[in-house]
């Protein structure tokens, strides 16, 4: 919670995602699953608010992650980490190394959500271990020296946790999950959720749409942000009209399409009628 004293100042880098969500605007997020330093600069240049760093399905060393988080700070863009596990110390180490927030996979109940908040927020909201001399605290250069500055308040206010809704159980418990203090929003993992919904008895084609609608309603009721993985711009526009503000589009996997197009262009340029490709 912010102190009543208006002279309180913040020394921590402010989250662009949270600034957008708090003002009711869309947080523009692209994704990255490989160690591509140049991609950070490109994302920041093209006005993305955050990079979704996928460590659930991709492997990186700790030093590679630290390097990318440092580049995000230098480029003034948030890094939203999707972690490979919810192990307590691992989570807050990402924050100390500069992550702006988390996208937590398979947050299927309120207990999971509370456990993550416990690990990533300082008291009284959580039980995160205190260091204060990582990248997030400017390595201690200023964080402990300015009057009315408070690293723990900064960290609680300028970092976020978004829970992924990826199972039918999570949909059935969505109100309990989104109501957890310290959960800033929900994000529907359309692939995993759609897979599981389709395996149920009496499944219908509209089950995923109904689940997304349920997430939207619960998030709106509790005053939290939400979003959903989208496979088309039409879906993004639809979710935006439904109130989605966590918007993801674009990723390093898009390089496949770039190379495909370049290959076709090369074929067109190099072939002639007498020597078809």
What are these regions (language model features)?
Residues 8-79, 85-86, 118, 179-183:
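Conserved N-terminal beta1-alpha1 strand-loop-helix module at the mouth
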Residues 8-31, 142-157, 213-214, 221:
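N-terminal amphipathic alpha-helix/helix-capping segment at the start of soluble metabolic enzymes
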Residues 21-37, 82-84, 159-172, 225-230:
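Active-site mouth loops of central-metabolism enzymes
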Residues 30, 54, 102, 116, ...:
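Conserved, mostly hydrophobic/aromatic
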Residues 62-88, 92-96, 120-125, 156, ...:
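Alpha-helix-loop-beta-strand connector modules within alpha/beta enzyme cores
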Residues 68, 110-126, 255-276:
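C-terminal helical cap(s) of enzyme catalytic domains, especially alpha/beta-barrels
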Residues 89, 101-180:
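Conserved anion-binding
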Residues 101-115, 186-197, 245-262:
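Glycine-rich phosphate-binding active-site loops on the catalytic face of alpha/beta enzymes
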